[in-house]
Amino acid sequence: MNKYIYLLAVVFGLSSCNDFLELSPTNKVIETDYYKTQEDLTEALVAAYDPLKWNAYNAYSSYELVSNIMSDDAETGGSTVSDQPQLQRVNDFTNWVTPTNLPEGLWGRSYEGVNRANIVIEKCPLLPEGTMSAELRDRYVAEAHFLRVFYYFQLWRFFGYIPYYETNLGLDDITTVPQLQPDEVYAKLIEDLDNNVIGKLPKVVPANEKGRATNGAAIAMKARIVLYQNDDTKMKEIASQLKELITDPAYQYDLIPDYKVLFDDEYEWCKESVFEVNYTEIGNSNDWAGKANQGNSDIIMLGARGLKDPNNVYVEGWGFAPVTKALNDAFLPDDPRKWTTIIDHEEFRAEGGTISSDVNQYTGYSVRKYHPRAGYSSTVGTEALNYKNNYRVIRFSDILLMASEALLRSGGSVGEAQDYYARVVKRAMGDDYKVPTVSLDNIYKERRYEFAMEGIRYWDLVRTNQAKDFIKGWDDTKKYLPIPQSEIDKSDGHLVQNPHF
């Protein structure tokens, strides 16, 4: 994987600034004295990216893992029903989470990301003249706005009714920050992207900067937000913006020919990658709370228990997020994405391998895309925390399918929509495959095949009003998680608990 962000942390001493960034924002003298140089702001920007990695923060708060087990594509799994109870409950919509039993790290890691992004946005314009070029300063600020939108996007999807602020809070401010309605949060996210991000970031970055936000990532993020909101007034606009990413060669996006290699290490940041979260196997961490980790701690969670591979490709893990039979059966038998996504335990055993079935919610299937592999971790620090697998957050195939959907929903060119849809289908099934006629229903099915176990399916079901049809026990009262009770208590009652809790 690319080590840019990790190496910046080493060069500029990110670990030395972590404690400072966790100090109360009321320490104005410290803040005023600290952010004086370009290196200081580089360090602050790296710190704002860092919560993207915090999958194990406060008892497993991975955006991707939680999203997968909330969907119909995965169970929770683990060793027993008591293994990580907050994850067990988020998968069971008939005995769902409570304000004191949920993956509350989703809240904390996201707001820490917001706080760190706000520091960059506030401090960059205050640097002494001549300290930093205007071009670089503006790029840093735009990146920080992108990150703030990303973190608020997660909070909006998971919690809905959230405190929203653009300047960090002092201890006395916590009771005055507005708690916005979901529609109000949506408007803020679009406004921030339109005014402060899109058009202000580079279209491409050099190899040593992979992991930093680009204009393509910002446009894709806007499209995801608009589609999740089902804002038909903006479908034509995002169709046009996505078309720019598809047709402008300056962005350098394209599908790679072979889907089967997409999740191999050497294809991180390939021409199909729009945005990834970088991880490294060389982080010297034993921090199970997650903040100091530079490796992807989700990977060990996803591995099949008791796995022994005679080919020494895969290694065992902890058996979380077992793939459901429903997902396995949804694929056409000859769709290569099925093999890339799923390890079929019967087939694995027939080839001489071993996998334990003595696990919680055993299904007979595990995820292959992010299964732990031999050589992808190291014994520096805690080996289980140090997997280098990047998360592919946005891929070019998503650009194509979002553009196709937006065209259909805005009355745009059906021919273009068919072309974009067909590119994704044919990459998987071959040029001779008879591609179905594009429709919203076919796009939604294709999204399941293309992005299975990438943290997308659940949100697609919710936004298309299909969650109740595919997820047992789901109804509209389950759209949002409860706000953690600890946060309600800290606010002295200012925060109002979400409806239905």
Labelled PLM ranges:
Residues 141, 148, 222, 229, ...:
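Structural register within alpha-helical repeat arrays
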Residues 17-23, 38, 74, 80, ...:
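Long, intrinsically disordered, low-complexity segments
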Residues 87-94, 325-395:
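Flexible, polar/acidic helix-loop-strand segments at domain edges
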